[in-house]
């Protein structure tokens, strides 16, 4: 799941000419690395998939540079992104996870820009995190991984993963009857659910976190397209 940040602050950061350089130097604290990985993916609007593929390959290379042979490479998916010309994106397997990453990203964007504008006597200033080797040691430090595992246990992540966790379900006729029952079951199985209906009360029926109710006539192609776009913006 994703949380898009198209705020003026995120947009300004994404529009910085050297954003790829300053955003990929490292996190503002090594404590963040278990949530954000060392760097974000920089999404090139002309080829988003290639950007993701390049990130995955770069992460594997980073692991190979510093592993002592005893560690197991973590998954190579990014945890946040800078979408050039648009803003930032936080990724997570559920809304709690993506929300944590989104909050960290907001602080990171501000801190990087503050550091870039900071001029210290005898120094050129600029954003300079710790070395990449130190970041690797922090990311793969047993106590860091144990900390993340402990936090996940507290929010129930050690339980059986729901079948539809990380999925987005769109249900038509969702304000009542079979549609509502299906929506509730999908939600119970871990999906975030977008409910569509002609009933104007759909927005109040779907008021829980992880649910979105939209007034929509499914025979209207433009209305359905709008609903899909809203689902993307929300989740």
Which role fits each region the language model picked out?
Residues 1-169, 181:
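Glycine-rich flexible loops
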Residues 161-194:
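Canonical Rossmann dinucleotide-binding motif of NAD(H)/NADP(H)-dependent dehydrogenases/reductases
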Residues 196, 214:
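The conserved SAM/SAH-binding core of class I Rossmann-like methyltransferase domains
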Residues 198-202:
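Helix N-cap at the beta1-alpha1 junction of Rossmann-like dinucleotide-binding domains, i.e.
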Residues 204-206:
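Short alpha-helix adjacent to the SAM-binding motif of class I
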Residues 210-211:
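Short, conserved active-site loop motifs that form the nucleotide-linked donor/cofactor pocket
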Residues 215-229:
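The beta1-alpha1 cofactor-binding region of Rossmann-like NAD(H)/NADP(H)-dependent oxidoreductases
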Residues 230-235:
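A glycine-rich helix->loop->beta "capping" turn
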